[in-house]
Amino acid sequence: EDVIRDIMNEKGITGFENLPINLSICTVDTLTTDECIFTTKEENLENEHIHYITGAPLETAVRASMSFPAIYTTCPYDKYNFIDGGSKDNLPVKILRDMGVGKVLAIGFDIMTYNPDAGLGGLIKVIWRALDVYSIDGTRESKKMADLAIDIKNENTQLFSMDSVDETIQEGYDAIMAHKDEILKVFGEQNSAE
């Protein structure tokens, strides 16, 4: 959380309350297995197995959303013990719809493409693929609920490889630019800029 807080300080951000937009950050509580959504403002929503949390430190919410199982430790806060929200809902379109968001652009990595390998690399890939299996049906449904869904192809990128960060960013940019006309058609041109 200290690193996140330092970045926030550099940007002049003290918390949710002074962000230029409403922000929702998804995570999962390991104690209840419920989804938990950190929000900028009180949403007054009641959904079974979803907790809406306001008033939490922004750095805690960001840290909680990064708590990828077996890579980072969980993030304890209040009565919760958080892990990455993608563990349960890898494309939280329904959450946004429930919160009244008008149009939703769903952007995610292409998890439908899978090429098994032999050896240790293949073992690691199959472990990650097993995790995909748990959320893939939800991801499919989320794509249907979005106004537009875009897959980022990144088959050459290794999960958690810092050497691949620039390549992954470029692949994301390329995916968006390849769909630019469609995005502008669905969401309007009021904020178009390259």
What positions do the PLM features span?
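Patatin-like phospholipase
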Residues: 1-194
